Amino acid sequence: MRIINGSVFDGEGFVEAADVGDGDVLDAAGCYVIPGLVDVHFHGCLGADLCDGTGEALSTIARHEASRGVTAICPATMTYPEEKLAGIMRAAAAFAPTDNEAALVGVNMEGPFISPDKIGAQNPAYVQVPDAAMLRRLQEAAGGLVKLVDIAPEEEGALAFIDEMADEVRISLAHTTADYDCTRAAFEHGARQLTHLYNAMPPLHHRKPGPIPAAFERDDVTAELIADGVHIHPAMVRMAFRLFGDDRMVLISDSMRATGLEDGVYDLGGQDVTVRGNLATLADGTIAGSATDLAACLRWAVREADIPLESAVKAATANPARAIGVDAERGAIEPGKVADAVLLDAETLDVRHVVLRGRLLA
């Protein structure tokens, strides 16, 4: 496919599109042309969830995400027993996308190795201490698709788990009560990511700094951030980008099955979630994921939080691809990589067209 006109993201900024390539012509006048988006932390959409453990659910998710410009997905599990997680992993391993479905490039294990004291919307009944043998069994069931594993580093055996598994899978700190020193220790042992920055962790405090400063002090640690207009105030989004720099921020949607549907009550990890607009909450008011997609998060970050477009694009494409080790094939528009691209309206930043594996989606 040939894309003419428009402004193309080259990894650092935007350049005018060159009239190169073969095949059908796509006129990108009035658009920004960016790489296909990569969401490494979300749960589902259109009534489907990764944890449904079926090919049908994965197909629904992959089709909707592709239509929204998310061409590579790494959906997240919830906290469940091993038997349930194994079924989810087997379904993921068996999934093969059709022409209009996003590529399943990984699975994110958000539970069960988390803290019961920072449970969020996870089910406390199934929380357990980190277990390397269990993770290896699940990785085998997934055919190697597990790319991210969340862990609360203060829990029993967590640092030993990181020592053993950090060379096999990316370890992210999540749903944690860890203080600054514990977090630093986890990074020294090999953890390399902080899950949904600010959420489900001790807040920044001048005498009890907590996980956030421990993360930004290390150049090899990335931070996820939910830019949905609900989870985080715009000022805190700006602060995160300034602290970490745009090479270390990973935008995520953390979307759940209500995304793309009307307001109502939906299931997330076996618990009822009430959705009103972009706000998804448990009965006690706890925020329970989001009801938006990564393209909308990118737009909100730019238009409402004043993040430079170039920085937001990095955080939704190259950075997540690098975080889960698929950057050799995805996250940039360049020779040798999968031909995924998204055309954003230059004025509204709405998704106008999606190119998926070299084909224009209808």
Tell where the protein language model's regions lie, with residue ranges:
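N-terminal metal-binding scaffold of metallo-dependent hydrolase/deaminase domains
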Residues: 1-25, 348, 355, 359
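C-terminal cap of metal-dependent C-N hydrolases
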Residues: 6, 322, 332-362
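Conserved, mostly hydrophobic/aromatic
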Residues: 30, 41, 65, 109, ...
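Divalent metal-dependent hydrolysis catalytic cores, especially in the metallo-beta-lactamase
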Residues: 43, 59-88, 102-115, 142-156, ...
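Active-site gating loops and adjacent loop-to-helix segments of metal-dependent hydrolytic enzymes
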Residues: 63-74, 115-143, 185-197, 201, ...
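Active-site core of metal-dependent hydrolases
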Residues: 136, 140-261, 361
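His/Asp/Glu-enriched, well-ordered alpha-helical/loop segment
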Residues: 213-223, 229, 241-253, 258-344
